[in-house]
Amino acid sequence: MTSRMPLMAGNWKMNLNHLEAIAHVQKLAFALADKDYEACEVAVLPPYTDLRSVQTLVDGDKLKIKYGAQDVSAHDSGAYTGEISGSMLAKLKCTYVAVGHSERRQYHHETDEIVNAKVKASFRHGLIPILCVGEELEVREAGNHVTHTLTQVEGGLKDVPAEQAETIVIAYEPVWAIGTGKVCGADDAQEVCAAIRAKLAELYSQELADQVRIQYGGSVKSGNVAEIMAKPDIDGALVGGASLDADEFVKIARFRDQ
């Protein structure tokens, strides 16, 4: 039995304004019981404009839900219009920040070098990066999905020391399964997540590899989460659309009951 605490993180993407965010987090908090938090860490990744409202709610009501951002600047401050720095997120008491999400790589042309700089920026400010990796459909169909994903893992962790790497979360998200309704089979997801863990052992140590949490992301729902979570190298889920439905996200967090 793994000692890794499962992490269910809801990536809201560009959805929910700050008022909707408050109502949504309140609904999650009301539905989740102490036993749920003992079995699983629950986090939300709202848009930047919601973070202060979520922080105020979590602090004021002493909620056990964690929160974080969907991206971070590689820079700490300066003339970078539209960017948000790690120090700003740290001041909002964010725990997590997603880095290298496929939509950032695809629409904002983020390379492994940029993702690596953002991983380092996260660590500089005491944030835990959720490093997102995964392949497009043509890469999988060519049989290169493992190699492609491990290249992203290695690129994202370049020059990251072990004492930082041991706290990172890695999210395997096959791009072709995100928001499409297509689900990567649990065995296929396990294949890549096991390869990621083996790569961590190669880059650092087996001990470190056994510590790192590896999530699966890609059309996760309450109906498939139990099968995914039964796999030995999958330690949680990065949930997109389903996290916008509070009842559904609570069911996902209660994967052990599904």
UniProtKB/Swiss-Prot annotation:
PROSITE patterns: TIM_1 (PS00171), TIM_2 (PS51440). It comes from Streptomyces avermitilis (strain ATCC 31267 / DSM 46492 / JCM 5070 / NBRC 14893 / NCIMB 12804 / NRRL 8165 / MA-4680). PANTHER family: TRIOSEPHOSPHATE ISOMERASE. This is Triosephosphate isomerase. Belongs to the triosephosphate isomerase family. Gene3D superfamilies: Aldolase class I. InterPro entries: Aldolase_TIM, TIM_sf, TrioseP_Isoase_bac/euk, Triosephosphate_isomerase, Triosephosphate_isomerase_AS. Pfam families: TIM. It catalyses: D-glyceraldehyde 3-phosphate = dihydroxyacetone phosphate. It is an enzyme of class 5 (isomerase). It comes from the Bacteria. The lineage of its organism: Bacteria, Bacillati, Actinomycetota, Actinomycetes, Kitasatosporales. One of its GO terms (molecular function) is triose-phosphate isomerase activity. Homodimer. GO terms for cellular component: cytosol. Substrate binds at residues 11-13, 179, 219, 240-241. Involved in the gluconeogenesis. Catalyzes stereospecifically the conversion of dihydroxyacetone phosphate (DHAP) to D-glyceraldehyde-3-phosphate (G3P). Its EC number is 5.3.1.1. GO terms for biological process: gluconeogenesis; glyceraldehyde-3-phosphate biosynthetic process; glycerol catabolic process; glycolytic process. Its main location: cytoplasm. It is found in: Cytoplasm. The active site is at residues 101, 173. The keyword Cytoplasm applies. Pathway: Carbohydrate biosynthesis; gluconeogenesis; Carbohydrate degradation; glycolysis; D-glyceraldehyde 3-phosphate from glycerone phosphate: step 1/1.
